[in-house]
Amino acid sequence: MASLLRFYSDDLYGIAVSGAYDVKAHKGTFSVDTEYYPVPKSKDVDLSLQCKGQFNWEWQIIDCLTFKMRVSERLRTWGVNTRTDIRTDFCYAKDCISATARFNVLRCRGTSFVNYLEGGYKRNNLNVYARQGFFIVDNWDDRIYVYERDAPGSFNVPAMYGRGLWTSLVMAWRFASVGRLYARASYTSYPFMSEEKKKPGKAELKLQFVFRF
């Protein structure tokens, strides 16, 4: 277990505590971060306090099947007082085949959902991953960030907002000892939005060649 005490004169005081455990078939980590702001964050409150906590748990059910869960909570004295995020992953991996089912629910101003299924193939010089998901996020404060596979050097973590579907296909191919080809194609649509809030779909196609000498 570790702890950290932070002090910033006139701006912020904080303390953080974290820990981890690992036993047969189970392991987990936790962290708690508390902050006090001497200058109120809102004119509606006299005291500005914020506490963030997160717990991660992983269970190796059998050799090829793993269950992962992440629970995080944010408490504060101004604005929306609570923000609860619960995410679960069922992960299968055997030989060259992998699959993941994610279920993510977040509660802040309202309740939002992001779920997806992903299948993967990884063998020697070829990696391929396909993902299909849907999201229901009606408030910007309830947005959920999702890490998307992409080419090296690209940081792709979009904020899911609205009501829609998305599909992505990512490939990495080593075609020679010095060459790599990375490809990504994706499409996001919003068929479940109301007429007054309807948004156009978004399509992406990316090719990246890397040569190493």
Briefly describe each language-model feature range.
Residues M1-F213:
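Exposed, low-structure sequence patches enriched in small/polar residues
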